Amino acid sequence: MSAQCGLCFHRCRLAEGQTGLCRARANRGGRIVPLGYARLTSLALDPIEKKPLRRFRPGSLILSAGSFGCNLRCPFCQNAEISTAGEDFPARDCPPEELVQLALGLRTRGNIGLAYTYNEPLVGF
């Protein structure tokens, strides 16, 4: 049974077992399911200046987290290996509650929050 994904502008129509253009959603039993939910491919404590923000809390750190999959194909993407990967890419399970606790635990090292990055964050919704 085919199903249509409505998460992004591509609106992929997927046959049973097929994965969408983003490689982060698939048709399983006629339902669109997220493949990367609560799975991390990358995790790092980064300077806030690495984010595309200007003059936001300069000198602070932020926990950067990301998974696989992206609905874009930017020719300049510095994370293409991660963002265009699929569910076979090495990832670790990390439920949202665990990620929040990790971010909170890093406050003593100057962490100010959590940034979803490395891939297009919407596809993991």
Model-found features: residue ranges?
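Local cysteine-cluster metal-coordination motifs and their immediate loop/turn environment
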Residues: A3-R25, F68-A80
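Conserved Radical SAM active-site core
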Residues: N27-F125
